[in-house]
Every structure is written in C-alpha cells, then in structure tokens.
Amino acid sequence: MAIRKIPTTADIYLEVDGVRVAVVQSYKVTASRESKAIYAFGQSEPVSTIRGQSQYVLELTRLYATDEAIRDGLNFCEMDDFSLVVCKPDRNVIYTGCQWKSLQESAEVGGNVLEKVTVEAGRRIENLL
C-alpha cells in the first residue's frame, strides 16, 4: 500500500491590493457554517436543512512586515480588507475580505514582528496550479 503524502505549505503571506505586505510563519484555520432546519406543516422533525453562511477564523503566528511595507508606513492596526495567501505545491488558498480581530505584539529592539493575529475572512478561494 502506497503512503500518500499531504502537501505542506510553501509560503504564507498577507496581501493588500495585490501587494505582499507581510510574511507569516504559521497559520491555523477554523471554518464553521450555520444551517437552518426546514419544517413542513404538521411535521415534528425537519424535512431538510438549508446551508447558511460560512465563517473562517484564522490564527496567524509570527508576522513580519516586508521592507517595502515598512518604508510605506504599514500599520497593522489600520489594515482593512486584506487577503491571506497560502501557497501549497498543487494550489493556492486565498482568504479574502479579511479583518483583524485581535493583535498580540512582541518584539525585540530593532525588530518588526507581530507574534499572533486573529483574523476573520469573508471568503475562501482555491486556485489549482
């Protein structure tokens, strides 16, 4: 029996208007979706369910702003409607419409790093390579 390998991530970064502004060391995604039960008249049990909205919560660890973004005065606290791009060997996964929920910052003198950022994304797109 052949062992099938799971593709690992080759690159993770944040984009604003198509420009890479930060690299990310690791990420964790929690996807959830609401659903609604549909009841027929006189039935005590649902006859169907309707799929609701999906929600993506991403936990990003160790973010480093790019040199260009630093020169342009990037401020993570003011970032709005950005994308997270996860490059895998066979596809790119892009989370768009991102808004940050929480920021935990820790840095050494002369360093530019955000330790942990929690983000909510509006949409998930997969592009096969």
Please name every model-derived segment.
Residues 1-64, 89-116:
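Solvent-exposed edge beta-strands and adjacent loop segments
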Residues 67-74, 128:
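Short, conserved charged micro-motifs
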Residues 120-127:
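Hydrophobic lipid-interacting interfaces of membrane-associated proteins
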Residues 71-96:
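Short, acidic/charged, Gly/Pro-enriched secondary-structure junctions
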Residues 45-48, 81, 121:
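Short, surface-exposed, charged/polar-biased interaction segments
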